[in-house]
């Protein structure tokens, strides 16, 4: 049988970078690694929990792309690469006002007020998440800082695309329709070179589990210089768990 290696680990140091940046002794390494996994777990858990509790259902391509952790002697710095924060966590999205250079002073003041409210809500939600992680963990370092980094193009991020498909499946959208829509959005808005999506499990409630996949463009898994983003994500449906895999070919190059 064919053996498939993880596309991200296969390209680590070539086109992929590490998500944890720190040095440790042999005794510290296992503890730091476990702590990093717990930090990521609790952040993802917080986001998913509040998405389900929120009254807002039209998240689109919003979610967490990746979480980078940097350690200093006295500080743990967690950088969350995300799209749609904090609108995916709070009830009632803040609608962004269209900007125009020829607006009156009144409209300009209104825009400033909207931006001020957005920054205020972002800070509040980030602080809530920080407190949640602090309560859930006993961190080795005393200081713990969390910052946000906005994803420039969410359609090129495999994690965000997989989360979008999972939400569609959990809302009982047909799996083929969800796959085709995600591929169309990635090709048109993400300007990706290729994308492949695979869904496995009891599709449409069938008694026998099967695997379905769709691909558009090139996805060269054996080319090391190919920048490929990959994600495996579970979807909790009425008939059981569906496994979603997404490969996105972003282009060629070296880190």
UniProtKB/Swiss-Prot annotation:
GO annotation, biological process: translation
Q: Where is the KH type-2 domain?
A: 51-124
Q: What is this protein called?
A: Small ribosomal subunit protein uS3c
UniProt GO MF annotations? rRNA binding; structural constituent of ribosome
Q: Which PANTHER family match?
A: 30S/40S RIBOSOMAL PROTEIN S3, SMALL RIBOSOMAL SUBUNIT PROTEIN US3C
Q: Which family does it belong to?
A: Belongs to the universal ribosomal protein uS3 family.
Q: Output the NCBIfam families linked to this UniProt entry.
A: rpsC_bact
Broad class of the protein's primary localization? plastid
Q: Where is this region: Disordered?
A: 96-121
| Listed Polar residues bias regions | 108-121
- What GO cellular component entries does it have? chloroplast; cytosolic small ribosomal subunit
Q: Which top-rank group of organisms is this from?
A: Eukaryota
Q: How does this polypeptide assemble, per the annotation?
A: Part of the 30S ribosomal subunit.
Localization annotation: Plastid, Chloroplast
| Encoding gene per record | rps3
Q: Which Pfam families match?
A: Ribosomal_S3_C
Annotated coiled-coil segments of the chain: none
Return the Gene3D superfamilies for the record: 3.30.300.20, Ribosomal protein S3, C-terminal domain
- The region annotated as signal peptide is none
What keywords appear on the UniProt entry?
Chloroplast, Plastid, Ribonucleoprotein, Ribosomal protein, RNA-binding, rRNA-binding
């Amino acid at each position: 049988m064919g053996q498939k290696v993880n596309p991200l680990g296969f390209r680590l140091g070539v086109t992929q970078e590490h998500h944890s940046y720190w040095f440790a002794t042999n005794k510290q390494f296992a503890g730091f690694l476990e702590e990093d996994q717990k930090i990521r777990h609790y952040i993802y858990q917080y986001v998913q929990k509040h998405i389900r509790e929120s009254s807002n259902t039209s998240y689109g391509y919003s979610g967490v792309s990746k979480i980078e952790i940097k350690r200093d002697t006295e500080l743990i710095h967690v950088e969350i690469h995300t799209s749609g924060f904090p609108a995916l966590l709070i009830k009632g999205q803040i609608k962004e006002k269209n900007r125009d250079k020829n607006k009156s002073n009144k409209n300009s003041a209104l825009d400033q007020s909207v931006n001020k409210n957005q920054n205020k809500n972002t800070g509040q939600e980030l602080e809530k998440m920080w407190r949640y992680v602090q309560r859930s963990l006993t961190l080795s370092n005393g200081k713990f800082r969390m910052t946000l980094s906005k994803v420039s193009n969410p359609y090129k991020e495999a994690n965000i695309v997989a989360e979008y498909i999972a939400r569609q499946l959990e809302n009982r959208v047909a799996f083929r329709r969800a796959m085709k829509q995600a591929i169309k959005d990635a090709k048109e808005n993400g300007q990706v070179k290729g994308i492949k999506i695979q869904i496995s499990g009891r599709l449409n409630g069938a008694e026998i589990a099967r695997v379905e996949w769709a691909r558009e463009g090139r996805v060269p898994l054996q080319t090391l210089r190919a920048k490929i983003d990959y994600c495996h994500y579970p979807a909790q449906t009425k008939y059981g768990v569906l496994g979603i895999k997404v490969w996105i070919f972003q282009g060629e190059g070296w880190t």
